[in-house]
């Protein structure tokens, strides 16, 4: 018998608690991650996005108290912010945030003017730089299979952004990227899916492949042209 959370019932309880705590101050509520994609398992986090009209430290404390009243508290995570901060956020960070968030209450469409080609290319570059650093650091120091799995997960999100930049379409499920992206990106996604499904880690070869891929994209993002 599956112990995956009945997310619809849980969200209804969450929304009632949120309304009781913050009333009409709630500007947006959304769901991210595996529950939003229909891929949740028993250990999946419940990634809730809550944007208030404004956010204070006291609001953070109130939200924490509210979460403590809910079931599956250990699985709850996500994003809490004030509206003004979100609208002034680094645009490169907002690309994945916008497209990975399933709206429940309100809309994030005010973010769309910020998500231009410059923001998308910058999102790719920042991410591959971080993956490059993480990969080298892990090859030298931690030598951790779990870290490598996490880096491939991050890389699969970058491939989503690359696919959007190339096609104009956001593909939510990684498996649906496979017939769309180029062979280098396909290898990254295929490795991620293999690891996600419990496949064995070939630490040296997988690390070298990820290193080379991120290195290549650092160079490519340095000379990307804006597409018409």
Placement of each model-derived feature along the sequence:
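Metal-dependent nucleotidyltransferase catalytic core
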Residues: 1-21, 37-43, 49-91
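Alpha-helical elements of Rossmann-like donor-binding domains used by nucleotide-donor carbohydrate transfer enzymes
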Residues: 13, 17, 96, 209-216
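Short gly/ser-rich loop at a beta-strand->alpha-helix junction or flexible surface loop bordering the NTP-binding
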Residues: 26-35
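Secondary-structure boundary/capping residues
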Residues: 27, 76, 186-187
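Short, polar/flexible loop-turn hinges at active-site or ligand-entry regions and domain interfaces
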Residues: 52, 58, 105-115
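Compact structured core domains
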Residues: 96-104
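Conserved nucleotidyltransferase catalytic core and NTase-mimicking acidic/glycine-rich helix/loop elements
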Residues: 107, 113-228
